[in-house]
Design a protein with these regions (language model features):
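Conserved beta-strand hairpin/beta-sheet module of binuclear metal-dependent hydrolase folds
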Residues: 2-60, 150-153, 157-161, 254
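Metallo-beta-lactamase
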Residues: 2-5, 99-148, 192-198
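Active-site metal-binding motif and surrounding structural segment of the metallo-beta-lactamase
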Residues: 40, 51-98
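Active-site neighborhood of phospho(di)ester-bond hydrolases with catalytic His/Asp-centered motifs
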Residues: 45-47, 69-77, 97-100, 159-163, ...
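Short acidic active-site motifs
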Residues: 84, 282-286
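Active-site-proximal loop/helix segment associated with metal-binding centers of metalloenzymes
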Residues: 144, 148, 164-191, 234-239
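FMN-binding flavodoxin-like domain, especially the glycine-rich phosphate-binding loop
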Residues: 171-211, 215-218, 260-276, 286-383
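Short N-terminal or domain-adjacent regulatory/targeting segments
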Residues: 212-239, 313
């Protein structure tokens, strides 16, 4: 695959992985991206997952056409990108590894000391000339590991963005970018919005024509769309108008309340309502929707003087990713001492700029006229 006249794609598609990072379902697989810059000196940008050593080295050999690379640039040390550093150096022992000091420390941790005999330690803002192409290294700590840096090629105006602007899905599957990029961002990078904002500010000073991430397609058209979404996500603003109703239910009574609220909102003309059974939906997609929409209703039962486990897990996913700037409402159920709303609100106590609905729906075992009226009032408050 040709990115520009001098930049080639050397990555691989993985359709064997079932859970990315041990937790995210990837029905359309994953791409582990690597790039080669062909110039007077040749730079290889990152490696790939350990299971694709031979395929990746074969890809490199075809692109190199008998030449040998001068540099391996390591932007990110997560093993799906760094696992083949040793195999690369075994194949091309004269190549120098280009990375920052934190990256070299991690290389020692993963591979043991002494792997990189020929190395170029770069600092933030430093450049490396390949001949026609000049690479500038921009540090991006905690996007989403501390050693991360991105690389800007000023000749072809390409930003090699590490995990930034990545998405789930292999490159041989055609699918819309936004949803799987959103799920990827919220799940993996979402905690570090401030750090992403800092990187976006640095990137704004660059003349970028192409973004080459470590997962997902190279982005060439309408870059403003992708950058705008990253700005929204990393500033914790709602992307779309709508209400998400996330519920857990033991015997169906809390589910009935959630479905009633869904119906009432639709009757009132709510632009978008997403109803999610947390025991059965994909948790990462549920978290994605909570961040996508501006309003969230949490409905669950009191369980062991706490809340139902799937709801607790869901809220923990939200808070560890700095959930904020949203409107939240509660529906609680309890046969003798309903306290779920109190527990859920306490879990969100440290979340910034949360507006709570005036009405909390309290169900004692099953919906009755009083709790139905509360649901109807909550629907009005959400409009």
């Amino acid at each position: 695959m040709t990115i520009t006249n001098d930049i080639r794609y050397a990555g691989v598609n993985d359709h064997q992985v079932d859970l990315f990072e041990g937790q995210y379902t990837v029905p359309n697989g994953m791409a582990y991206n690597s790039y080669v810059i062909l110039d007077e000196k040749i730079a290889v940008m990152d490696t790939v997952d350990q299971h694709f050593q031979h395929e990746w080295l074969d890809n490199l050999a075809v692109i190199l056409g008998g030449r040998k690379p001068d540099y391996l640039v390591v932007q990110h040390m997560e093993p799906d990108h760094s696992a083949n550093i040793a195999s690369f150096l075994n194949a091309y022992p004269e190549a120098a590894v280009v990375a920052n000091a934190k990256t070299f420390a991690m290389i020692d941790q993963f591979f043991g000391p002494g792997l990189c005999e020929n190395k170029v330690v770069v600092k933030d803002g430093e450049s490396l000339s390949l001949g026609k192409h000049t690479l500038t290294f921009v540090f991006a700590p905690m996007v989403h590991w501390p050693e991360v840096m991105v690389t800007y090629d000023s000749t072809d105006k390409v930003l090699f963005s590490a995990d930034g602007f990545g998405k789930f899905g292999a490159l041989d599957v055609e699918e819309e970018w936004d949803c799987e990029a959103r799920r990827y961002y919220i799940g993996i990078v979402g905690k570090y919005g401030a750090q992403v904002q800092a990187l976006l500010k640095k990137a704004a000073a660059l003349d970028i024509a192409i973004i080459c991430p470590l997962h997902g397609p190279a982005l060439k058209d309408n870059l403003a769309h992708y950058i705008n979404l990253y700005d929204i996500w990393s500033s914790y603003r709602a992307e779309s108008e709508g209400v998400m109703i996330a519920y857990t239910s033991v015997y169906g009574h809390t589910k009935a309340a959630a479905e009633l609220l869904n119906d009432k909102l639709n009757e009132l003309g709510c632009k978008k309502v997403v109803l999610c059974d947390l025991a059965r939906c994909d948790m990462a997609e549920a978290v994605e929707d909570a961040f996508r929409y501006g309003k969230l209703v949490l409905a669950t039962t009191t369980y062991n003087a706490d809340i139902f486990p799937f709801m607790r897990t869901f809220i923990e996913h939200l808070t560890e990713r700095n959930y904020q700037n949203r409107t939240v409402g509660f529906i609680e159920n309890g046969a003798w001492a309903p306290m779920a709303a109190k527990v859920m609100r306490a879990m969100l106590e440290k979340s910034k700029d949360i507006t709570y609905l005036p009405t909390t729906v309290t169900i004692k075992s099953a919906l009755k006229s009083a709790s139905v009226a509360q649901v109807e009032q909550m629907a009005k408050e959400l409009m």
